[in-house]
Amino acid sequence: MNLDTRKKFSLKKLKTAGRLIRQGRFNYVLIVAKRQIVAFYRRNAPYWLINLERRFAARSSRQEESFKPLLTPPFKVRSLTRNKPKIRAAVILDDFSLACWEHEFQVTLLTPNNWRSEIASNQFDLLFVESAWQGNNGAWSTRLSQPGQVDPVLHEIVTAFKEFDIPTAFWNKEDPPHFKQFIATAKMFDFVFTTDSNMIPEYEKYVGSGHALALPFAAQPIIHNPARNLPDTPGVPDPRWHQGDIAFAGSYFKNKFPERRFQLDILLKSAVTLANENFKFSIFSRTGFADPNNRFPSYAKPYVIGSLQYEYMLSANKEHKVFINVNTVTDSPTMCARRIFEVPACGTAVLTMPTPATKNFFSDSELVTATDSTTALSSLSILLKSPAMRDRVNHRAQRKIWSEHTYRHRALKVAKALGIPSDEYERQLAVPRVSVICSTNRPSQIPHLIEQVARQVNVEVQLIIATHGFELSQSHKLLLDRTFVDYKVVVTDTSMSLGDCLNACVNESLFDYVAKFDDDDIYLPHYLEDQINTLKFSGASMVGKQAAYAFVESRNALMLRRPEREHMWTNFVAGPTFVGPRATFVANPFQSRTTGEDTEFLRSVVNGGGHIYSGDRFNFIQMRHKNGHTWQLADDDFLAQGTVESFGFNEAHAEA
């Protein structure tokens, strides 16, 4: 094609493009123009540049094939906990809330059609209604949220409950933006609970002093927990666990909540910056693409992959390393997004912009916050590039959640306010009582054992020591007297096996839980608290640590054994980390042997239909001394079971 012909051909193309634009087919012209530019690039770019591009595209394609965020499977419960209290509640709840509250009450879903028959056939303890948009699978769609209006059927329901002297409670989870939409409904109830404590004075104008209380969001450990596989697949990990890097799930508002939009732009731009470094970033848009007022800005659009229903979002929570978060309400001491509690409980870190609520609920060591674009980018980079930092922060957040911010804590508050017997909640949330058992044939290790047990926090401990072939010295007895309120010493003969000695300790135990300690290992202060928390959210017959730190004295090395086994349903955990209900130890006595008693104990638990859960890796160090151990395993073989993380004995490395 000569030069004149090329000019004529190009001119013809321009005329065609002009005609198409006048016809309104601008998008088509852009697509064709892009193709032409790419074709020109392919014909004229140097080979090395095209080859580099192809290699990068192939790598990106492989990454995309390895993890597709929208293909997340529907959520399956990974907890065996089944301790639902007996309080009977008639409820009207949206799906998110129902998934959390249904484990705290014996719930009955009221609808406009069934409420009379349900009241007639049940003896309810309370009526619990939230600021529902859909309510009980759509049965109450838009009926509760009409400003200044009360749904007549709901009015009949509330009246009926009051006639039967059954307390009624309304929970507005949409305060303060939607206060006016729900106040007409809320003021019918005996008590009003609000996610924003700043709104209490407003509600008290309608329901009276003391009848309006704060009730923030929380986590439900049965569905929000860090388990990485299912109980019926021990040792088989979830292949999608933390395969994504950064995620955001929520909405973008162009024309309202300006402070939220400003904060979200900061976090989204930081995520996009890291996405350009080849980190995977996914935006799950709650409002979709239909409304232009809710469309994400152009810089973020390439990362908007769609939306997920809540049952799929529960799975997605476990599939990304970091979620970014903003809060619609930025001045409340108690109102914040659900994900502040739910996502860390699932084992995923959260980066959020700070509000009074986030500062009120979590310390800086438990939740990472960013105040501007600089700290947002640096904090997000640290969370992605430093797993050790990310895991420790998240572990501390989980501990705070298990101790203060579960729906069991919220249900206790509701029950107390309404005058409903709350003994069941209080018993389950009480300080756990643990009998620590240890059999030792080394008098020199008694002070070390006492020190390890005495420094446990947030638990009540009974110590039971089997002295194998010796009696305690007077100094040891004095040390025990000064340290413990409750302890027992069982003197056992040298002819007794280690298994028999441990059974003798179990027989002397008095508390609900039993924990087996070794006399030379390191148990950091939160060890027992964390193990009991793990036992509660997992519902396992036995918990322990398969992923655990160990110090190999001959190499002066601190290693992490089996790191891939953290938070896994399994058939094995380390013997010095056994923790379980006393009933498990009674039903599965140790065999009368001195080696292999731990392995046979675990086999007995599994063969009896029990389940074993390997918890976190923190707050325990197994000691492997130069002078040997009961294990018949060379140091090199031992080191081959994990990775060396530091040199020199360093408790702080294992602490969280």
What are these regions (language model features)?
Residues A388-L418:
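A charged, aromatic-enriched C-terminal amphipathic alpha-helix characteristic of glycosyltransferases
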Residues K413-A454:
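N-proximal low-complexity "stem/linker" segments adjacent to membrane-targeting elements
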Residues F511-I522:
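Short beta-strand-to-loop acidic/aromatic patch adjacent to the donor-nucleotide binding site
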Residues P525-G596:
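Conserved catalytic core of nucleotide-sugar-dependent glycosyltransferases
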